[in-house]
A protein has these predicted regions:
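Soluble "head" domains of membrane/secretory-pathway proteins
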Residues: 2-27, 42, 47, 51-52, ...
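Hydrophobic alpha-helical membrane-embedded or membrane-associated segments
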Residues: 32, 36-43
Length: 299
């Protein structure tokens, strides 16, 4: 006979307490996860978000494989600012236009994919190109030869034969320093006068006019264009390898002038950069593929 029944009662209490403690632990963990998700959503919505560079249109400053952090607050917020395609207001809150020279992230007006270009023209500005020279409000933008840019060739970076020269496993391009009236300056690449080029649609087929003739655009020589209200004229720094506001908006192709509502953020810092040779199943290649010298570069 049990002379001390309290012992049996305590044992029963201890056994029932364990499942309760486990339930509390799981509950605390779920609450922590929800708080973490909420914190990430708030950060990516209102403060900053991350973007990758998929093409060479912003050479020499940005390279394929760069991972950027972009500030969300400079241009305000709307549905295009929200991560993961979450619903939001269609009209921008705390709206601001970019400054000329800002590197902007925006949604393509047709397919809504993320693009990155440099803001060149604001509402009311007149933009034109003459033999590769940018004309802003009737005045040539200051443009100086700046030697050559040497872009290392890698798994995600080739060398264009129509504009570059292979030198010691790098591609050499002529570069120029362009300086806007505000004093903002940056490097651009120029392959020379490329002449008129045919436009293609989203499937890669040639676009034709009503007479069946290919539609041609000479991006080095364009007629003066006045940027409408609420729009931004953008260009890639790699002037002869960029489908930008000089081209009509076509999915996967040109972007036309960008509606202010399509702005996502202002590019800031390169957080990571890879030459494209890494393999997910070989973790050590994540480090051998890294371009360590690019990490921390600012726009």
């Amino acid at each position: 006979m049990n002379e001390n029944p309290a012992i049996g009662e305590n044992a029963t209490d201890t056994n029932t307490a364990k499942p309760e403690e486990e339930e509390e632990s799981w509950g605390s963990f779920l609450i922590f996860c929800l708080k973490l998700v909420l914190a990430v959503l708030i950060f990516r919505t209102f403060i900053a978000s991350f973007f990758t560079i998929p093409s060479e249109s912003m050479l020499p400053g940005l390279r394929t494989g760069d991972y950027l952090i972009a500030a969300k607050w400079p241009y305000g917020y709307n549905e295009n600012s929200l991560p993961l395609g979450l619903p939001g207001p269609s009209e921008r809150i705390f709206a601001n236009l970019p400054e000329r020279g800002d590197v902007v992230i925006f949604k393509h007006p047709v397919d809504r994919t993320d693009y990155v270009k440099r803001a060149i023209g604001l509402p009311g500005d007149t933009i034109a190109m003459q033999d590769g020279q940018l004309i802003l409000n009737g005045e040539p933008v200051k443009r100086e030869e700046a030697g050559y840019a040497y872009i290392p060739m890698s798994a995600n970076t080739a060398c264009r034969s129509d504009g570059g020269t292979v030198v010691d496993n790098a591609c050499r391009y002529r570069q120029f320093r362009e300086t806007l009236p505000s004093g903002k300056s940056y490097m651009t690449l120029d392959f020379g006068n490329m002449g008129a080029r045919p436009l293609r649609d989203a499937t890669g087929n040639l676009m034709v006019d009503k007479g069946g003739r290919p539609v041609l655009i000479d991006a080095d020589n364009t007629e003066p264009f006045v940027v409408p209200a609420g729009k931004v004229f953008v260009m890639g720094d790699n002037r002869d390898n960029s489908l930008d506001s000089r081209f009509p908006p076509v999915s996967g192709q040109g972007v036309g002038v960008i509606d202010q509502e399509l702005l996502v953020g202002r590019a800031g810092i390169v957080l990571w950069s890879t030459d494209g040779s890494a393999e997910w199943l070989l973790p050590w290649t994540w480090f051998t593929a890294a371009r360590w010298d690019r990490i921390g570069d600012t726009m």
